[in-house]
């Protein structure tokens, strides 16, 4: 058996802009609606990141495949919701997971989110999902 290793991803530092209101964030979001960038927002801070590369996608897809196999074998009636964008004006948060899942029928939002993280810095992802009740 051969063990394959993945190349180290390029380090990408997010751009952070502080002191925005939700309304200002939504205006900036419309202006920056371009392929290749992912915007997140938490507590008045806008984070702009370049879309992840091949290594990130490989790890994401492999982890998702393992999780989906487990959910099938465990008998969950789950729905993959992909990189669904989630936001809450009241919680002052917007986040887009790498992958997400509803673990039972009839749910309005995902129960589980997958984030593949190679670098530190940026917004507190766990706090974002906590506010989104995921």
Residues covered by each model-derived region:
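Gly/Pro/Ser/Thr-rich low-complexity, intrinsically disordered segments predominantly at protein N-termini
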Residues: 1-132
């Amino acid at each position: 058996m051969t063990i394959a290793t993945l190349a180290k991803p390029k380090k990408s530092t997010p751009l952070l802009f502080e002191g925005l209101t939700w309304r200002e964030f939504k205006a900036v979001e419309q202006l920056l609606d371009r392929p290749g960038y992912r915007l997140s927002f938490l507590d008045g801070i806008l984070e702009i990141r370049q879309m992840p590369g091949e290594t990130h996608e490989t790890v994401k897809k492999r982890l998702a495949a393992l999780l989906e196999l487990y959910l099938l074998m465990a008998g969950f009636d789950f729905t993959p919701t992909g990189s669904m964008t989630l936001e809450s004006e009241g919680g002052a948060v917007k986040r887009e997971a790498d992958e997400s899942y509803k673990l039972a029928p009839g749910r309005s939002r995902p129960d589980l989110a997958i984030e593949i993280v190679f670098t530190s810095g940026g917004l507190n992802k766990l706090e974002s999902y906590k506010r989104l009740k995921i």
